[in-house]
Amino acid sequence: HGNVEFITNIKYLEEVLNGDKSKTILDIGAGTGAYSVYFDKQGYKVTAVELVPHNIDVFKAKNSNVDIHQGNALDLSFLPDESFDVTLVFGPIYHLMNKEDKFKALLEAKRVTKPNGIILTSYYMNEYAVISYAFMKKHILESKGDLTEDFHVINKPDDLYSMVRLEDINEYNELAGLERIKIIASDGPSDYLRVYINALSEEEYAEFIAYHLSTCERPELLGASSHVLDITKKK
């Protein structure tokens, strides 16, 4: 079945864009271009920044009109201030291990976004990582040194992913001067239920998506989702 996170993020991005094709999009940490190419095909002007050369090669092979740059989310100095209506920060934040770098990436995203623009940031959540890795996969005993007393994952410099809790995200927004419009559980329970979801018929899966989209803003589901999408504007 389709990717629940992608379906959800597209729905909220389309709400933000509201069909206005004059709005410009910046996709920071664009990967192989899933979101960039989708909105390019819808007729939006999209600029993408990606760090990894292999990803850029795959992206370019998709033959889109996206303006693709190799670059780092921590330094977008090749892009002018206040030049994009909608800025996506879907990959970088959970690949940056320390708070200073996350803060720097958010500040760069904010700098290149227009005064009335919207910044959408994806985060990888702590509870999903602990439940799925430490307990479902039975790594808890050897993982104890990687967790604080209250079970927050300790991010180490050579880790691939950095996990956060909602209060961490609130702190980053406060530091970066971003004001939340809304926050969404992009995957909801889907990553826990993958085996069951994959066994659903197309009709049943459509009902699951309807359920998820009707509940993904509920506060009680946010922290347990594998990812959240934070939709913010400049203060």
Describe the function of each predicted region:
Residues 3-21:
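Conserved alpha-helix/loop element of class I SAM-dependent methyltransferases that forms part
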Residues 77-87:
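A short acidic, Gly/Pro-enriched loop at the edge of an enzyme's catalytic core
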Residues 86-100:
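A short SAM/SAH-binding and catalytic strip from SAM-dependent methyltransferases
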Residues 103-115:
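A short glycine-rich, Lys/Arg-flanked "PGG" loop and its adjoining helix->strand segment in the class I
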Residues 119-146:
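Conserved class I S-adenosyl-L-methionine
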Residues 160-176, 183:
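Short alpha-helix
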